[in-house]
Amino acid sequence: MKKLYSFFISTLLVSSAVCAGGTDYTKGLAIWFDAPNTLQGHAVWYGGRPDMWKGENKPETAGDTARNPDAAWESQSLPIGNGSIGANIMGSVEAERITFNEKTLWRGGPNTAKGADYYWNVNKQSAHILDEIRKAFTEGDQAKAERLTRQNFNSEVPYEGSREKPFRFGSFTTMGEFYVETGLNIIGMSDYKRILSLDSAMAVVQFKKDDVAYQRNYFISYPANVLVMRFSADRPGKQNLIFSYAPNPVSTGSMVAQGDNGLVYSAALDNNGMKYVVRIQAETKGGTLVNRNGKLTVKGADEVVFYVTADTDYKANFAPDFKNPKTYVGVNPVETTGQWLANAVAKGYSALLNEHYQDYAALFNRVKLNLNPTVKTGNLPTGQRLKNYRKGQPDYYLEELYFQFGRYLLIASSRPGNMPANLQGIWHNNVDGPWRVDYHNNINIQMNYWPACSTNLEECMLPLIDFIRTLVKPGEKTAQSYFGARGWTASISANIFGFTAPLESQDMSWNFNPMAGPWLATHIWEYYDYTRDLKFLKETGYELIKSSANFAVDYLWHKPDGTYTAAPSTSPEHGPIDQGATFVHAVVREILLDAIKASEELGVDKKERKEWEQVLANLVPYKIGRYGQLMEWSVDIDDPKDEHRHVNHMFSL
């Protein structure tokens, strides 16, 4: 019955797409707006002037800030993705602006001009300082303990591209923007809707102009790895379009025509030489198409479908060669994109849409949420719903939508075969971005995956597990250098090139986070706990958990009274350097419990299990403070008026 229902829905999607405006996509689970978007952010790295891109005066540090300069993109665009490529649909009438991403397009890494040694030799040899720090704690010299930690538990790697050339840590960077001029004017436009259908993982733009109903459909297929964009109307000959592409402005490349209706852009990032390829092909019904000067010009067509795909030469590596600058290079994007595009065009729009829906629905439709199905609300634009909700009006549908939007975003940004969701999932509109749009290991990447297994999306957890595997070998060097410890760990920020060291800053409230690795490793057990995949635990998961637990044991301070505490430690982005931050103890407890249970499941490592149990039994317990609160630090300095956004110590609950 489920398969029959799925077939019916997918058939309805395909058939309704034949006639522009034939389906009300605002029904069901949908985020939608009733006013068109601005075009002001177009090619934001040049202030909306892509025509200025001449390969000179490249904005190397553009976006080196915590603020996105394109507010409409951030709050009004429609995000679609398949775990590898992503796009944001802006939905203007005069032109369609689409920001485009491929998740592995990163600056930085070992292949910059200064090579592999420059990239990897960043860990300080600081393990011998731990005894001195712990002695300072014992003697009550908090200032000395903090000073020694600040001076010795950072690295020499800046977090800002403006402060280092070549930039080692790097950043996730845009693959550019597509711009489709329509020849239409907003004057006289009516019935506008810009819709993100969570039921079908499709973005739709609909409006009427001069008694013509126009419709644009967008989806990104995971099976085909292609972005599909369909421009149609309910009258023939109404598609007059000019398609152009503004590439990443800190790369060097060239656009060539591919036949009468295709474009291929091949380039390499200036920072590290990472190669990437973008392919576009237009298929029209009626009218004419001219392919000239890097633009596709369509006149008088009934319908236009654009097929787009992209790839980089990045290769994930679980055992990187620290001497080889190209240890993360291994894919030919010319070949991969050529095959993907040829296959997609051969299938055609309807078959791709059906395949896309079947693939997506198999994940999304596993969970339904009905908070109060007897209470009905009107079909309002999402912005109006939010305004009403903030005024105190109940809206159970909005709450259901919010829940399912989280699941949708995870499906769109995390599928097997690529990197996990980053700070912005898979979506980015600039050269650089807030916090390098990296992998923040002090709660952000973990938060991305909280709904994975618990909402029946365990497959979406696999990219995170593969990402953790890429950190192990570099993380062993970090664990040994800073703590003289077995196993592996990571620090606050990671990239796709195995970066596990702390950064340059001496602000230890955020830059000192050795529990990042064990916290990541707890997700390994979570995946097993939900799936009960014993083969996975035996062949992949257990060693990751075991080595992380061993790091946690070696990192702890075994005090003369027999107890274990975390010194030095911090509560992420908040408060002083401590000798027993609750967050750290909570993660240690969790990873030790995971290791104990995993070893019992497999019937292995009785000796290590005994050690883990002994440490767990003697770990300093949680403390209750003067307000009846769970203390965040080893001393009772919590302030009930403190509204800091990080409350990581609550992990213990």
Residue ranges and their predicted role:
Residues 1-22:
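Bacterial Sec-dependent N-terminal signal peptides
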Residues 444, 513-527, 540-554:
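Extended, hydrophobic alpha-helical segments in both membrane/secreted and soluble proteins
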Residues 533-534:
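Short loop-to-helix capping motifs
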Residues 6, 15-16, 221, 569-572:
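Short linear Ser/Thr-Pro motifs
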